[in-house]
UniProtKB/Swiss-Prot annotation:
This is Chaperonin GroEL. Its main location: cytoplasm. It catalyses: ATP + H2O + a folded polypeptide = ADP + phosphate + an unfolded polypeptide. The gene is groEL. Keywords: ATP-binding, Chaperone, Cytoplasm, Isomerase, Nucleotide-binding. It is found in: Cytoplasm. Forms a cylinder of 14 subunits composed of two heptameric rings stacked back-to-back. Interacts with the co-chaperonin GroES. Its EC number is 5.6.1.7. GO terms for biological process: protein refolding. One of its GO terms (molecular function) is isomerase activity. One of its GO terms (cellular component) is cytoplasm. Belongs to the chaperonin (HSP60) family. It comes from Shewanella frigidimarina (strain NCIMB 400).
């Protein structure tokens, strides 16, 4: 086992803080409408330019093991915020840094770290409850566009295109982001259905650059059982070979000999085929298979209704314009089902939603209804160069996550104002001692940090801006985009409640752990062994007499 180096007390905390500051300082320059870009070196291809906090955080690895531990813990804050809400990573990092800096000062002054942490936790619980009270519903297209615009670094075209996409496919519809070919952003809306089952074998992949399978005008075979014997599929495969069209098999499972034979046939180019598991489980799987059948104009081959796979013909198969399969998802685009039957199926599911008493069942039924009635919207990001394309695509994805979060939990005033208002309302949180009270104060100070950073990035004096906003009421705040003060909601500066809440909770969680750290252990770096020296040359023979 390699030797370890151990640091205690203040020595450990100083090193950890240095790492936190390096990472947070690199991330926080991107915050707000006047935040700057960060350039990331890539081992191949052109450098990546980004304004996305989590992308910057993920790139950072420090040489010093102890500093790196601090940096990695703050990286975790950004990653967690990104996973939960898809945005707010920079805000989370700024909050974490503010709590750690103030917390470690208090620990150095002799306060009890555990009580400080408890005080911070109490303040955060109160703040989250207060945020929910401040939150307003986000349902109209204008508000959705404003949220998207703010998240995409004040790019109105991105906010508008996301709002249009949501309007067309519904808030539950599937929206994907792709790299486009033009200079401008484009929106394609295609009727379709997506479900969370990927390919059963990577050998079906025909688009290695994206790791996906694309089938044009395929037949779709729907089977409500496991398929393991290839003989059952032979009649269908022989009929298909004559048409030259690809086949998608959706079954409970395809395994053993059947899967192996399909893979071999596909690789040899005899039949273009792909197989995926049917979505859902039990009765829900039967219902979802029926949904796919109605959407594609096919029939579900199920023994309980007297249909056998061996006797199936091409008439039993559904068809679609296109099918795209990744390792996680299958999207059926433009199924050729009868529109009247699709509408009837949607009405039937709507009735089931009204009759259902379980929230879980309602949610799943609404999901099915959205997939049948909605469609798939594809936002194609346009840019002049590949470097700009990557940067813009990341912003569009962030904005899409933010708008989904806004629809889910509502919106609050943006620009760091919501946290400032929350802080003013929770000053009197109940605590047990002075150290816990100071923990609450640390959390309240940290809640001003995002507003201060937005002002700093806009070239303003942070303290002046913070005091002006604190002296105001309600949604009064600072618009860094045009350097004015006013009502943030009226100016269209909104943040999703979920994003603000997640940022605060994850920042406080990890910062609290860092404040209570008393020792750090890391491996001692190994010096590489010196190379073996070359052998000395042999002396020459003496001259002969």
């Amino acid at each position: 086992m390699a030797a370890k180096e151990v640091l205690f007390g203040n020595d450990a905390r100083v090193k950890m803080l240095a790492g936190v500051n390096i990472l947070a300082n690199a991330v926080k320059v991107t915050l707000g409408p006047k935040g700057r870009n960060v350039v990331l070196d890539k081992s191949f291809g052109s450098p990546m330019i980004t304004k996305d906090g989590v992308s910057v955080a993920k790139e950072i690895e420090l040489t010093d093991k102890f500093e790196n531990m601090g940096a990695q813990m703050v990286k975790e804050v950004a990653s967690k915020a990104n996973d939960a809400a898809g945005d707010g990573t920079t805000t989370a990092t700024v909050l974490a840094q503010a709590i750690v800096v103030e917390g470690l000062k208090a620990v150095a002054a002799g306060m009890n770290p555990m009580d400080l942490k408890r005080g911070i936790d109490k303040a955060v619980i109160a703040a989250v409850a207060e945020l929910k009270l401040l939150s307003q519903e986000c349902s109209d297209t204008k508000a959705i566009a404003q949220v998207g615009t703010i998240s995409a670094n004040s790019d109105e075209s991105i906010g508008d295109i996301i709002a249009t996409a949501m309007e067309k496919v519904g808030k539950e519809g599937v929206i994907t982001v792709e790299e486009g070919q033009a200079l401008e952003n484009e929106l394609d809306v295609v009727e379709g259905m997506q479900f969370d089952r990927g390919y059963l074998s990577p050998y079906f992949i025909n688009k290695p650059e994206t790791g996906s399978i694309e089938l044009d005008s395929p037949f779709i075979l729907l089977v409500d059982k496991k398929v393991s014997n290839i003989r059952e599929l032979l009649p269908i495969l022989e009929g298909l070979a004559k048409t030259g069209k690809p086949l998608l098999i959706v079954a409970e499972d395809v395994e053993g000999e059947a899967l192996a034979t399909l893979v071999v046939n596909n690789m040899r180019g005899i039949v273009k085929v792909a197989a995926v598991k049917a979505p859902g489980f039990g009765d829900r799987r039967k219902a979802m298979l029926q949904d796919v059948a109605i959407l594609t104009g096919g029939t579900v081959i199920a023994e309980e209704i007297g249909l056998e796979l061996e006797k199936a013909t091409l008439e039993d198969l559904g068809t679609a314009k296109r099918v795209i399969i990744t390792k996680d998802n299958t999207t059926i685009i433009d199924g050729s089902g009868d529109q009247v039957q699709i509408s009837a199926r949607v009405s039937q599911i709507k009735q089931q939603v009204e009759d259902s008493t379980s929230d879980y069942d309602k949610e799943k039924l609404q999901e099915r209804m959205a997939k049948l009635a909605g469609g798939v919207a594809v936002i194609k990001v346009g840019a002049a160069t590949e470097v700009e394309m990557k940067e813009k695509k990341a912003r569009v994805e962030d904005a899409l996550h933010a708008t989904r979060a806004a629809v889910e939990e509502g919106v609050v005033a943006g620009g760091g104002v919501a946290l400032v208002r929350v802080a003013s309302k929770i000053k009197d949180v109940e605590v047990l001692n002075e150290d816990q009270k100071h923990g609450v104060v640390i959390a309240l100070r940290a809640m001003e940090a995002p507003l201060r950073q937005i002002a700093t990035n806009a070239g303003q004096e942070a303290s002046v801006v913070a005091n002006t906003v604190k002296n105001g009421e309600g949604n009064f705040g600072y618009n860094a985009g045009n350097d004015t003060y006013g009502d943030m909601l009226e100016m269209g500066i909104l943040d999703p409640t979920k994003v603000t809440r997640s940022a605060l909770q994850f920042a406080a969680s990890i910062a609290g752990l860092m404040i209570t750290t008393e020792a750090m252990i890391a491996e001692v770096p190994q010096d590489s062994a010196p190379d073996m020296g070359g052998m000395g040359g042999m002396g020459g023979m003496g001259g002969m007499m």
